[in-house]
């Protein structure tokens, strides 16, 4: 296998020699860092079971190796990798899987360990969405996830991934993660803080990741991480679970941050050992019970994961002085709700009691019920999903709602060629037109969007920003 030419600062190498446990070889560490990273995917069980997914892709001759710490995760090798990007396969476009590095599946596995079933979860640094979508799948779209992202440019990507995966229980915010301890004290059953870090573990994906590395920079980052974990711990309810993770390898940003938190709140922080999280987890476990994953252990990116429980109430932070502003939505009730539900069912869309209808001007939205107690405490960028726009002839159903809520009542199956045309933003001309004037078009049994019948043509409503060019779908696809 070809090797990457990785840049290693001398001080970094000295630090790693000291950090490596005695049973791990430094030469093996360097060799692992220089190997290209194995690609991996996670099946989106909100849309398809692992068993059905494996059956669906079996004709493609993909080599799928299970990731030991995530039942939905697989390392993937494909013969047609050069001819067709993994992100252009039909299964990815329709949200059946997420391209996610294997080690980054660890934090969510830890968050839900020992049958933990939280109703209110926060993902403090959520973009691009791999862990938010993994959390949503583990929650079965129930409860609520507050997915926060500080970087404005990454919020759009986060929403696009949430929408593609058919997720309805997310509320998006755009804040510095340090605000939540004061803004939403003791509000969450579980919190994931996948903290911004120096990224020492990603050199297999980015050989130049350490070009700007320095000990001083790491210490500055660690100071920010301490502020973030302190805020997250305040936002966690007593009895709740906090998972802290990074994709870096030094102790300053990992073990030391967690130990600092315990020093601040010795009676309230309980470290929960991760040695039995999955078979062979003991190979990466630290004396404190954390997982410090060096890249040679499981042939993946370097990663760190710690799990802790809040065992007592702690002194609250000062209440925030900012004003959230007026909330522009109003809940819908009674006849209005019944009218929308009936129209949606006719269009082939349905939802359960976890979602409630709200309106802003002519927009109809579905919000997760569990978010309602947070309204007025923080400003949201987006909550739930936009279901429809009201117009004089009824409702114009929105793409994200169709992807998440479509059932089998009003569907029209596209062929392989027609589905490719759909993703290219083109109208479709089926041999036999549907009987309904408006249908949910599907491929492989999964919704692609809403089409309006105009004569023999199905008018494409696929959002322009999602339209794909070039080659689509898998070479070995035997279905038509």
Curated annotation (Swiss-Prot):
Predominant localisation class: cytoplasm
One annotated Gene Ontology cellular component of this protein: cytoplasm
Domain of life: Bacteria
List of catalytic residues: 247 (nucleophile)
Subcellular location: Cytoplasm
Keyword Translocase: no
UniProt-listed Pfam families: Methyltr_RsmB-F, Methyltr_RsmF_N, Methyltranf_PUA, YebU_pre-PUA_dom
A Gene Ontology biological process term: rRNA base methylation
EC number: 2.1.1.178
Catalytic activity: cytidine(1407) in 16S rRNA + S-adenosyl-L-methionine = 5-methylcytidine(1407) in 16S rRNA + S-adenosyl-L-homocysteine + H(+)
Listed GO MF terms: RNA binding; rRNA (cytosine-C5-)-methyltransferase activity
Keywords: Cytoplasm, Methyltransferase, RNA-binding, rRNA processing, S-adenosyl-L-methionine, Transferase
Amino-acid positions noted as binding S-adenosyl-L-methionine in the UniProt annotation, renumbered to this chain: 125-131, 149, 176, 194
Xref: PROSITE patterns: NOL1_NOP2_SUN, SAM_MT_RSMB_NOP
InterPro entries, alphabetized: Methyltr_RsmF_N, MeTrfase_RsmB-F_NOP2_cat, MeTrfase_RsmB-F_NOP2_dom, Nol1_Nop2_Fmu_2, Nop2p, RCMT, rRNA_ssu_MeTfrase_F, RsmB/NOL1/NOP2-like_CS
Similarity annotation: Belongs to the class I-like SAM-binding methyltransferase superfamily. RsmB/NOP family.
HAMAP family: 16SrRNA_methyltr_F
Role of this protein: Specifically methylates the cytosine at position 1407 (m5C1407) of 16S rRNA.
The protein, known as: Ribosomal RNA small subunit methyltransferase F
Species for this entry: Enterobacter sp. (strain 638)
